[in-house]
Swiss-Prot record:
Ranges for domain ABC transmembrane type-2: 507-753, 1180-1404
Record membrane topology: Multi-pass membrane protein
Annotated protein name in UniProt: ABC transporter G family member 15
Compartments it resides in: Membrane
GO cellular component terms given for this protein: membrane
Bias (Low complexity): 17-34
Organism: Dictyostelium discoideum (Social amoeba)
Keyword annotations from UniProtKB, A to Z: ATP-binding, Coiled coil, Membrane, Nucleotide-binding, Repeat, Transmembrane, Transmembrane helix, Transport
Gene expressing this chain: abcG15
MF term (GO), any: ABC-type transporter activity
Length: 1475
């Protein structure tokens, strides 16, 4: 029996596992007596490591068992009657590190068995697994030309008869293996080897692949039947996706609420269970003190990267799955924390029979020895699978040599890399992955593995663990959950948990909520004052419609932000779906519950102000009906925007769709076009529109029972007609009144003006429309639930590379593989020739950094840090996660923009100059890369703008190619960087390499690197460290934070700055040959001796107490202050500050520092070219704008089809142009996300002094203009002539010209809003506040004469006013009005007057007033009054003049220039992101 089998069997009996532990280990050694001496030492080291873990964690439990079971330790009853369980209480009298994890898990197992629980012993077996992916040539970068090339290819007759078979390649090729329950399988391989794909395939996430061949079984259950148990085999990706505004407690407690099982211990309440597990997780990962800290992300301050990784792992553990697939889960963790994490998994696997499959980059020997088996992949092919103790010797026997102090995992992955491996003399080794695979399949270990797999599968057939597994799964589910459901808790419980979480998210981002309500409170008085105290006259009837219509628009515009919010949580939803935490529909119901009180408050805040300021009916019932209707309408609109987000892959497409819907719904509300005047082909849309039913309900509610008086405005009008004898012969100036009546009712106004059927009951009409509004809400809820369950726009962690057309490399080609290896070797060898790095001396002394944590309290993050870097030196910055390494780098690199920094930093003995950020490179931990560019384009952009101007462009590009080759990215040069959320682009580790490349190609003089090897495999890390070592040798000083350095990597560094938690120095000084100087310092303070085979980096972290279980009796910061090394450092630092000027100056141009390497003109050209390329490669954004303009143009044109010369058509012309105005206003919402996204990338570039802020501000305005020009022209051609606005060429040209200028203005206005706001949510709250002044005060919703005097200045300053005046007068100038019968105001003449004209003579020609229009005879005594003779009379009543057209054009042009100034100003003010 081998060591792995013993390890597994040890988990079957609690007592035997503990009492016989040493016997098992002895057996392990006996079983390997036939191995080589080196192999024996390896196994012994593995056993020693494991025993250390076991002894450390189970001492208390062993003692207790010996005393309790001394009579019969092998009696199973004693196993059941183990000591009572106790909950771990972190911080409760003992430190977190004292918690005995194995004790807890074993006791939990005993308790579960005692209460009838079953162990979920589910191993996994996979045979002949081949995963087929889409060939690289099948995915090309999309741009604006893509639709045309596609259309041309389809029109080519030759292509009709070709059967093009899409190219594919094997991501995995014929891979077999297994992992028994209670075992741990380590998957190793270089990037692109298929490690992640293997883990995804095992966890049944195969939707991204073309095909999957072979079989995967889980404890005897095949993959097809496993879907309903998907939560029992989870895939944990390497990236961390969490809601940044939630705290650690809120994040984990939510997961626990969704995964709380029903079969808990007797009398154990859910709250107790969750508290116990929560405390356990905090103790396991040493996060007790961070429980109330926000998780954060790259934009929200919170946990450190390593701490965030721990939360990701803890969240996955909450799922309590049987099989766990961890993909590079130690990324961002320091070596001690990574080892603690691996130990925890080992203990869980042993005690709870968890099956663990993990892929680690840069795993140490300590971690490696905790695993049972290892599977090594190279280019998708298995080159080894078997016990971890035999892997190293297998490759040594093959002919490879392992360097001293090189970890086994590094050696195993390095043998496949010609640049890293070393071949023993006299041996011939495989060259390609296919040759490695062939050698493996011919080995004896392969035959043994196949035999063992067959035996394991037979054992599964006999034992049938799936029976106990299914029974346990069933018992874990709540009573409200069906047996076939993969979810643990019921739908109702999920909704409650999600609702609480949603409120916590909102509370965590209080600023957005406050800005939302502030927006309401600012806008409500403005709306109220515009329609203040409306009278019960004809004008009051019309303005009531405008007031109610504006109330609808206000709440609809606030719903715009729901679209962007929908996209922020997609990846988190996808992750939780794979964990089976909750149904997507539950998330939507929780969002509904959450938004109801928020929207109720929003509507009441708005209505309580506007309703009574409007002067609407003061009846209490009518007020509450008004609020109730608006609440239902806003809920429906919110869900409509959310539906658009769930149905579309990007925010730009969703925004375009909603802009089209918004304009059409607004148009067919009945306010702009009355229902009875809508064209037949669009009449149906009135009934598919929540806007229209809300408007009908609100209008019916207000006008019910109202009576409008029109004595003063009756027709004919004048003193002559004031005699009571003429009263029967006058009529109200509206079609709603009967001839001879000087009043009209609200119900009749609605019937005549809008064509609505109010009878038989107005109350029934109101109730019917309110029900329809809420019906829309319910309909959208159902649609969202269906869409969320069916459509998934995320990639599930899978990335698909896309290349420039014709640039895709060959996949898994042996010759191509060999050629790539040769290029890397040549680039590495030749790199030294091109390196010449004049560096400088950089010193820092007494550095303190503190941040405010509430009130006047400051938290100290860096405490008296000092040191230096000299030319030619590599300094490692190390410490446990959260010790302040990144913070220190930010401070030294002058990246901090918040908090207080104290201390002295000098360059060559002088204060830092303005060019410091430019001449220093800073590789940040977060990879902020523009997704629309390729890797080569990104690196070239950095080289062009940051390289010295004296270096030719050809030399810069040549250096870029060398960096690409050295970093093994030559084949990725033309690959799109892409976006992880959509799964299109390069992988996480490839992004890291690109981020490093961006800094390296600039040839910085000082280099700061924050975790440059985090998430990279050993070979990539080795290449990068070796490369920056060459940089140091060439004269560059650099500081590099590093979490998990191997012994080989650590030896490349000259000095180390070691930090303890709290930002205090533990050690700063030389490392020494073989780290002797460093280790001797710690040994002098009582730490054990570091062996020659031990990793010094792990040794010093262990010594200073890093990690969860780390302990140290020495106060290392204090010991450092009292050490002679510290005194020597202080003295040398003083000398360096004095003699620093003797170091070579790093400035050029006669020593004058330059903030930027290139001129402002050159920067502007390059930035514009890059932005233009981004826009060109954003067809979703650009074509979305074009399609939006075409659809809106067509709908607008056919809605106002072939307008005639009637008086009503004069109104329709006005509203046609008003819709044109609204198109421009909605365009502002479209440009916001794109601008804010690009501004985030600009801030990263600006921090490194790529370019000045002015080129970005100007370029991002100019780059939009051609696309806006095309969009506006499309709209013009689709709507102008269709609507019947055709006139002479000059009129048409002026219409197009001022329309283009207005769109330019709108884009600039939207960008100015984006520039001043910190995020998209705030921008979407602010924008409605500002656009209210545009559409509300333009003279359409409220005619100029009725605008309150206080707001007249807004009307005159409003650019929309001048735009509408110019457009309307331009269109109506030469139109003669011919009234139809329906247009006429009908009245009866007295019989004493012979004609209608005689009766109306005083009215039309009176000396005291001038009246436009004309009177017609309708036969007999019936007369009709036409309001206007021509278009000029129509717009002159608004105070507009045709002569003001070009003045309006100039005013809009002036506003456009003002917007440019504002964009430039706000970009300048916000150019530095908060750090």
């Amino acid at each position: 029996m081998d060591s792995n089998e013993n390890k597994k069997n040890g988990g079957d009996s609690l007592e035997l596992n503990i009492i016989n532990n040493n016997n098992d280990n002895n057996n392990n050694n006996d079983n390997n007596n036939n191995s080589t001496e080196e192999h024996i030492e390896s196994v012994e080291q593995s056993i020693k490591e494991f025993n250390n873990v076991a002894n450390e964690l189970e001492t208390e439990f062993r003692d207790y068992l010996v005393e309790t079971h001394k009579n019969d330790v092998n009696n199973i009853k004693n196993d059941i009657e183990a000591p009572p369980s106790g909950e771990f209480e972190p911080g409760g009298g003992a430190e977190d590190e004292d918690f005995k994890l194995r004790n807890y898990f074993k006791q939990s197992k005993v308790d579960a068995i005692q209460n009838g629980g079953k162990l979920k012993k589910m191993g996994v077996s996979f045979k002949n697994l081949t995963v087929i992916g889409k060939g690289a040539d099948q995915s090309v970068v999309s741009d604006l030309a893509t639709p045309f090339t596609f259309l041309i290819s389809k029109l080519n007759v030759k292509n009709w008869f070709k059967k093009s078979k899409p190219s594919t390649f094997d991501i995995l090729h014929d891979v077999s293996g297994f992992c028994k329950d209670g075992e741990m399988l380590l998957v190793l391989g270089r990037p692109g080897s298929g490690c992640s794909s293997l883990l995804r395939t095992i966890s049944n996430q195969t939707g991204s692949y073309v095909d999957v061949l072979g079989s995967v079984t889980y404890g005897g259950i095949d993959q097809k039947k496993w879907d309903k148990y998907k939560a029992e085999c989870i895939y944990v990706p390497e990236e961390d996706t969490h809601y940044p505004t939630l705290t650690v407690r809120e994040t984990l407690e939510f997961a626990l609420k969704c995964k709380t099982p029903s079969n808990r211990l007797p009398n154990e309440k859910k709250r107790t269970f969750r508290s116990k597990i929560f405390n356990l997780l905090l103790g396991m990962f040493g996060m007790v003190h961070q429980a109330e800290t926000m998780v954060g992300n790259e934009f929200v301050r919170g946990l450190s990267g390593g701490e965030r990784k721990r939360i990701t792992i803890a969240e996955s553990m909450v799922s309590a799955s049987s099989i766990n697939c961890y993909d590079c889960s130690t990324r961002g963790l320091d070596a001690a924390s990574a080892l603690d994490y691996a130990k925890s998994i080992r203990i869980m696997s042993d005690t709870l029979h968890k099956t663990t499959i993990a892929s680690f980059y840069q795993a140490s020997d300590s971690i490696y020895n905790l695993f049972d088996r290892v599977l090594i992949l190279e280019k998708g092919r298995c080159v080894y699978f078997g016990p971890v103790g035999l892997a190293k010797q297998y490759f040594i026997d093959m002919g490879f040599e392992c360097e001293p102090r090189k970890s086994t995992p590094d050696f195993l992955t390095g043998v496949t890399n010609p640049q890293e491996r070393k071949v023993r003399p006299g041996f011939t080794v495989p060259e390609s992955s296919a040759e490695f695979e062939e050698a493996w399949k011919q080995s004896e270990i392969y035959a043994q593995s196949c035999q063992e797999q067959r035996e394991y599968e037979k054992l599964i057939e006999i034992e049938q663990p799936s029976i106990d597994f299914i029974q346990e799964i069933t018992e874990q589910k709540s009573k409200s959950t069906s047996k076939s459901s993969p979810y643990t808790t019921g739908f109702f419980v999920q909704v409650i948990a999600l609702t609480i979480r949603n409120f916590q998210i909102i509370w965590g981002d209080k600023f957005s909520l406050i800005s939302r309500y502030s927006s309401v409170l600012v806008q409500a008085p403005i709306y109220g004052s515009v329609f203040f105290a409306m009278s019960n006259s004809i004008d009051g009837a019309f303005t009531r419609g405008g007031a109610i219509f504006s109330s609808i628009l206000f709440n609809a515009l606030l719903s715009e932000q729901e679209l962007s919010i929908t996209f922020t949580g997609r990846r988190i939803l996808q992750k939780h779906k794979t964990y089976a935490m909750y149904r997507p529909a539950a998330l939507h119901f929780a969002q509904i519950i959450t938004e109801i009180p928020i929207i109720m408050i929003q509507v009441f805040l708005f209505s309580i102000v506007t309703y009574f300021m409007f002067g609407l009916d003061s009846s209490g019932s009518k007020f509450f009906i008004n609020c109730f209707t608006l609440i239902g309408f806003t809920l429906a609109t919110n869900n409509l925007y959310r539906l658009a987000g769930n149905l579309t892959p990007s925010v730009y497409i969703g925004q375009n769709i909603m802009n089209v819907l918004f304009l059409t719904m607004m148009t067919f509300t009945s306010y702009i076009i009355p229902y009875h005047q809508m064209p037949v082909w669009f009449g149906w849309y009135h009934y598919c529109n929540p806007f229209s039913f809300a408007f009908r309900a609100l209008m019916g509610n207000e006008f019910n029972g109202l009576k409008f008086d029109c004595i003063e405005d009756a027709i004919p009008k004048g003193e002559f007609y004031q005699n009571e004898t003429f009263t029967p012969y006058r009529s109200c100036a509206t079609t709603a009144a009967e001839p001879g009546q000087l009043y009209f009712t609200g119900e009749r106004y609605l019937e005549k003006s809008f064509g609505w059927e109010i009878k038989p009951s107005t109350q029934g009409f109101i109730a019917y429309n309110i029900c329809i509004v809420y019906g829309f809400w319910i309909l959208f809820i159902i649609c969202n639930c269906i869409v969320l369950n069916i459509i998934d726009w995320t990639s599930g962690g899978f990335t698909c590379k896309v290349y420039l057309k014709g640039k895709a490399p060959k996949m898994n080609d042996v010759e191509n593989e060999k050629q790539q290896n040769l290029l890397v070797q040549q680039a590495t060898n030749n790199m030294k020739e091109s390196l010449s790095m004049p560096g400088g001396l950089f010193t820092w002394q007494h550095m303190y950094y503190s941040v405010p944590i509430g009130g006047n309290t400051m938290k100290l993050l860096l405490d008296d840090i000092q040191g230096w870097i000299k030319p030619g030196q590599m300094t490692a910055l190390m410490g446990s996660s959260g010790a302040g390494k990144t913070t220190l780098l930010d401070v030294l690199a002058k990246r901090k923009t918040t908090g207080q920094v104290q201390g002295t930093t000098l360059l060559n003995g002088k204060p830092l100059e303005i060019d410091f950020e430019r001449i220093t490179g800073y590789v940040e931990q977060m990879d902020v890369l523009n997704p629309a560019l390729t890797v080569r384009e990104t690196l070239r952009f950095s080289a062009k703008l940051r390289g010295e101007p004296t270096i030719s462009l050809e030399e810069k590009f040549k250096y870029v190619e060398q960096v690409l080759e050295m970093m093994e990215m030559k084949h990725l040069g033309d690959a799109l960087i892409g976006d992880l959320e959509t799964g299109v682009g390069i992988s996480v580790e490839e992004r890291k390499r690109t981020t490093i490349g961006v800094e390296l190609v600039a040839k910085p003089h000082i280099l700061f690197l924050d975790e440059p090897t985090s998430g990279l495999d050993a070979q990539s890390s080795y290449n990068i460290i070796k490369f920056i070592r060459k940089l140091a040798d060439a004269g560059m000083p650099l500081v590099c934070t590093i979490h998990q350095p191997s012994s080989v990597l650590f030896e490349h560094f000259d000095r180390i700055l070691l930090l303890a938690k709290g930002g205090k120095t533990v050690y700063f000084g030389d490392i020494g040959e073989k780290s002797k100087t460093l280790t001797s310092y710690f040994q002098r303070h009582g730490v054990r001796e570091c062996s020659d085979s031990e990793n010094p980096a792990e040794y010093i972290l262990e010594a200073c107490g890093a990690g969860r279980h780390g302990k140290s009796v020495v106060d290392w910061p204090q010991a450092w202050k009292e050490s002679p090394e510290y005194q020597s450092i202080c003295q040398e630092l003083k000398e360096l500050q004095v003699t620093g000027s003797s170091y070579a100056s790093i400035h050029v141009d006669n020593g004058k520092p330059r903030e930027y390497a290139t001129s402002l003109t050159y920067q502007t050209i390059e930035v514009y070219k890059r932005l233009n390329l981004i826009w060109w490669r954003s067809p979703g954004y650009s074509y979305g704008t074009f399609i939006q303009s075409a659809l809106v143009g067509l709908i607008n044109g056919w809605t106002f089809y072939n307008l005639q010369d009637s008086a009503n058509d004069m109104n329709q012309r006005i509203f046609f142009i008003f819709n044109v105005t609204m198109l421009g206003i909605l365009l502002m919402f479209l440009v916001l996300p794109q601008f804010i996204t690009q501004q985030d990338y600009f801030k990263r570039d600006y921090a490194s002094k790529f370019y000045h802020w002015l080129p970005f501000a100007l370029s991002i305005i100019v780059v939009e203009l051609p696309f806006v020009l095309v969009s506006g022209t499309i709209f013009f051609f689709c709507s102008f002539w269709t609507a019947g606005l055709n006139s002479d060429a000059s009129t048409n040209f002026f219409f197009w010209l001022i329309f283009m200028l207005f769109l330019f203005y709108c884009v600039g206005f939207g960008q100015a809003i984006g520039a001043v706001c910190i995020n998209i949510t705030v921008a979407l709250n602010l924008l409605p506040v500002l656009i209210i002044f545009l559409f509300l005060f333009c003279g359409v919703l409220v005619i100029p004469d009725q605008i309150p005097h206080f707001w007249k200045w807004v009307y005159h300053l409003n650019p929309c006013t001048h735009f509408l005046e110019a457009m309307v007068t331009n269109v109506l100038k030469h139109v003669n009005v011919v009234c139809t019968t329906d247009d006429l105001i009908k009245f009866v003449k007295p019989s004493s007057f012979s004609t209608c004209s005689d009766y109306a003579f005083e009215f039309l020609n009176g000396s005291n007033h001038s009246v436009s229009g004309s009177v017609q005879s309708l036969g007999g005594d019936n007369c009709g009054y036409c309001l206007y003779k021509n278009g000029e009379e129509y717009y002159s009543k608004l105070g507009w003049s045709y002569d003001n057209r070009w003045r309006g054009f100039g005013i809009i042009a002036g506003y456009f220039v003002l917007n440019i100034f504002l964009v430039v100003l706000f970009v300048f003010l916000t150019r530095k992101g908060k750090r």
